[in-house]
Design a protein with these regions (language model features):
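Glycine-enriched loop-and-adjacent helix/strand subsegments that border the catalytic/binding cleft
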Residues: 1-95, 99, 123, 133-136, ...
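A generic structural motif
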Residues: 70-72, 163-167
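Active-site pocket scaffolds in enzymes
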Residues: 106-157, 163-165, 174-177
Length: 184
């Protein structure tokens, strides 16, 4: 399947928050089961849209709009989803289809939305940059630049809100709004 043909099979676009429970990952990997207990259920936006609904913001198999993330009410990031996206959805789907059949309902994620700055890592939104969509990425950049991370991982009670709006500020997909809860 070529990239153009693969892209034509994509029917709906949706936002996804694929979180990780970072403190559980090492022990889970040691058990040999992979990320089983360290990957909670993903959060999905309440609305899926067809690519044509995005108009000019959908081009080259990418969504060209800022993905806005707030952490505990403060802006954490607003990187443009189409800028610095390594592979288009056409490329991703074509690559996946090389070794498997992709049936109706298959969800293909593009990975973390991130933008570079001047050829290097981005800057936090709190420092005037576009920020990040992933706490682990911000912590990695902090470690590279300062020798250690300063941004904590989310804790019980913390809240994340992820949304993409159109040029008039209207929500395109609705918001993913999640709070970290303790064990049931």
């Amino acid at each position: 399947t070529g990239e153009r043909e693969a892209l034509a099979h994509g029917r709906l676009l949706v936002l996804v928050n694929d979180g990780s429970l970072r403190n559980l990952i090492p022990a889970e990997l040691a058990k040999g089961f992979g990320f089983l207990q360290s990957k909670p259920a993903s959060g999905f936006s309440p609305v899926a849209v067809t690519p044509d609904e995005l108009g000019a913001e959908w081009r080259d198999g990418k969504v060209h709009r800022p993905l806005v993330t707030h952490l505990n009410g403060a802006l954490f990031g607003r990187p443009d989803a189409g800028v610095d996206m390594t592979f288009s959805f056409g490329q991703l789907v074509a690559h996946l289809a090389k070794t498997r059949d992709l049936c109706a309902g298959t969800i293909v994620g593009s990975g973390t939305v991130s933008n570079r700055e001047n050829g290097g890592p981005g800057r936090p939104a709190s420092e005037g940059g576009v920020g990040y969509s992933c706490i682990a990425e911000q912590r990695t950049v902090e470690t590279i630049l300062a020798g250690r991370p300063s941004t904590p991982f989310m804790r019980f009670g913390d809240r994340v809100r992820i949304e993409m709006t159109d040029e008039l500020g209207r929500s395109i997909f609705g918001a993913i709004d999640q709070r970290v809860r303790g064990p049931a």
